[in-house]
UniProtKB/Swiss-Prot annotation:
Originating organism: Borreliella burgdorferi (strain ATCC 35210 / DSM 4680 / CIP 102532 / B31) (Borrelia burgdorferi)
GO molecular function: triose-phosphate isomerase activity
Listed name of the protein: Triosephosphate isomerase
Lineage: Bacteria, Pseudomonadati, Spirochaetota, Spirochaetia, Spirochaetales
Domain of life from the UniProt record: Bacteria
Pathway it works in: Carbohydrate biosynthesis; gluconeogenesis; Carbohydrate degradation; glycolysis; D-glyceraldehyde 3-phosphate from glycerone phosphate: step 1/1
Active site: 96 (electrophile), 169 (proton acceptor)
Family annotation (InterPro entries): Aldolase_TIM, TIM_sf, TrioseP_Isoase_bac/euk, Triosephosphate_isomerase, Triosephosphate_isomerase_AS
Length: 253
């Protein structure tokens, strides 16, 4: 049975002090969790050190929102895998739609980041995929998403696929208040899982975690998680307040 992974993505919100307050509240409340539920929080780079201290000894995983595929060099503003590991980062979100849009990250660049991350001892790398509203309206959802999956996982071995989490985030549902229906989300998740079977094996497909992201909140999370191919959520706005994130967690337990 696959575990449920609930990851909060705090994006460009909170100073170190503000992030620490929220992290402490969450860590205090999730001391006792079922073994099949994993909680993850992803603060801004500048808050990683403080948040790492706040959740030390808890069962919360610390994540980063992006990283360079280079280990060092002339890459102004970027951060390397080794730098993240120094802060105790255990997973990295890669290929988020906002990075694809605002930072012009291509599937090829994202794949380089995936392969670079696999050379380091991160527990997980989260590969985000998703279609725009125009692509959905044109009936290209599965074509776009599965192409992103294939390109993102290029040259990833079957032994390494167990460290990959896939996150389906329809671009039109991120930060808009719109959410894919459980049927729409399940259709894409099912197709992604089938694609993993084709690319790797039935065993890899059965074990890979596929999260849903896109305006997830305490009101819709349970019905989404009840779908057979949805294994968790990548949560943006609703993870910024400890109370709302904890409400989501409690609704899944």
């Amino acid at each position: 049975m696959r575990k449920t992974f609930l990851a909060g993505n705090w994006k460009m919100h909170y100073t170190s002090a503000e992030a620490s307050i929220v992290a402490k509240k969450i860590a205090t409340e999730v001391k006792t969790l079922k073994d099949d539920v994993v909680i993850m929080i992803t603060p801004p780079f500048t808050a990683l050190s403080k948040v790492s201290e706040c959740i030390k000894g808890s069962n919360i995983l610390l994540g980063a929102q992006n990283m360079s595929y280079m280990e060092s060099g002339a890459r102004t503003s970027e951060i390397s895998p080794s730098m993240l590991l120094e802060f105790g980062v255990e997973y990295v979100i890669l290929g988020h739609s906002e990075c694809r849009l605002y930072l012009a990250e291509t599937d090829e660049i994202i794949n380089k980041k995936i392969l670079a991350g696999l050379k380091h001892p991160f527990k997980y790398l989260i590969l985000c995929v998703g279609e725009t509203l125009d692509e959905r309206d044109s009936g290209k959802t599965l074509e776009v998403v599965l192409n992103q999956v294939k390109k993102g996982l290029n040259c990833v071995s079957e032994s390494d696929i167990q460290r990959i989490i896939l996150a389906y985030e329809p671009v039109w549902a991120i930060g808009t208040g719109k959410t894919a229906t459980k049927e729409e989300a399940e259709e894409v998740h099912k197709a992604i899982r089938l694609e993993i079977t084709k690319l790797y094996s039935k065993s890899a497909s059965d074990n890979i975690i596929i999260q849903y992201g896109g305006s997830v909140n305490s009101n819709n999370v349970k019905e989404l998680m009840n779908e057979p191919n949805i294994d968790g959520a990548l949560i943006g706005g609703a993870s910024l307040k400890a109370e709302s994130f904890l409400s989501i967690i409690n609704n899944v337990l």
